[in-house]
Amino acid sequence: PQVESCVVVRRIEKRTAMKAGRDFWWDDVLAPEAPQCEPERMGANDPLFILYTSGSTAKPKGILHGTGGYLLYATLTSKYVFDLKEHDIFWCTADAGWITGHSYLVYGPLSNGTTSLMFEGVPNFPKPDRFWEIVEKFGVNILYTAPTAVRSMMKDGDRWVNEHDISTLRLLGSVGEPITSKAWMWYYSTVGHGMCPIVDTWWQTETGGIMITSIPGAVDMKPGSAALPFFGIEPRVIGADGAEADAGERGSLVLTRPWPGMMLGVYGNAKAHKDVYFPTPGYYLTGDGAY
C-alpha cells in the first residue's frame, strides 16, 4: 500500500499549505456523509493496520496486524487486565500513533463499550497538575500511563496531586518501560492513596497486546515486577546456548506458544519476520532480556 491522499484536521488557526487533489480537509470529507454506516465485513486474517517499529536499533519494520486475532486480544486484555466495565472512564495517555494508543486508547476500550478519554498535550503544561485536573474534571476511573510520566510528576511534588479530588480512580497502569520501585510506591501511595491496584504491563508492538501483567484482585503486586503471564502466554528465559536459564539467571525472554494478538508478519519482508523473531525453532524471540 501507499499513501495517495492526506486528510487534514483543522486544529489550529494557522495557514496550511494544501496540495489540490492530494490533501483534503476533514470537515469537507465528512460533510456529505451519514452519521452512521454499516460495518465492512472482514476476514479474520485480513490486514487491519501496519505500525513501523525499529526497537532500539536496526531498520524500521512494518509490523502487520490482522483483524480477528488482534481485535480479540485487545478486547480480552482490556477487559481482564483493567477490569473494564461499561460505565468506566478509561484514560490511556499514549499517543494514538503508537501500539499502546491503538490497543488501549482505541480498539480495546471501545470494543468493551467503555468510554475512552483522549488527551493532547503533556503532563506538566500549563501547570504540573494537568493530569490530575483532567482526572477530576472527567471522573477518570482507570489511568494507564508511562513510568517516564510518573517520574516527572513525582519530581513536581505531591501538592499538585493533593489539590484535586481524584477519588474516582480505582486502578492504575504502567506501560512502555520498567517502573522503578520508588516511582511505583509514589504512584500507589500518592496517586492511588494506597487503594488502587497497579498493573505493571510488559508487551510489544509485535505482540498486539499485554503479555505479562498482574490481574487486579487475583495476583499479588510487587513493585518493579510485571508479575505473571497473561492467560495462555508461556514465556521462557534462555541463555546464549539456547538452553533454558536457571532461576535468577539472566538471559533472553522468549515465548513458546502462539497467541491471538501476535503479528501476521513484517510487511513486505518475510525473511526479516523469520530471521528477527524466529531464529530458533519453537521460540518467538522478544529481543528483551529477563531473569
Model feature map: region roles:
Residues 27, 111-114, 141-145, 154-221, ...:
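Gly/Ser/Thr-rich phosphate-binding loop
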Residues 47, 53-56, 78, 90, ...:
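Conserved S/T- and glycine-rich ATP-binding loop of Class I adenylate-forming
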Residues 95, 176, 203, 227, ...:
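Active-site glycine-centered loops adjacent to acidic/histidine catalytic or metal-binding residues
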Residues 39-42, 220-229, 244, 280-282:
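Short Gly/Pro-enriched turn/cap motifs at secondary-structure boundaries
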Residues 246-248, 254-291:
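Conserved ATP-binding/catalytic segment of the ANL
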Residues 71-89, 99-142, 156:
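Conserved AMP-binding/adenylation subdomain of ANL enzymes
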Residues 1, 62-64, 115-123, 199:
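Short beta-strand->loop structural element characteristic of the AMP-binding/adenylate-forming
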Residues 3-8, 19-52, 59, 69, ...:
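Conserved pre-ATP/AMP-binding loop-to-beta segment of ANL
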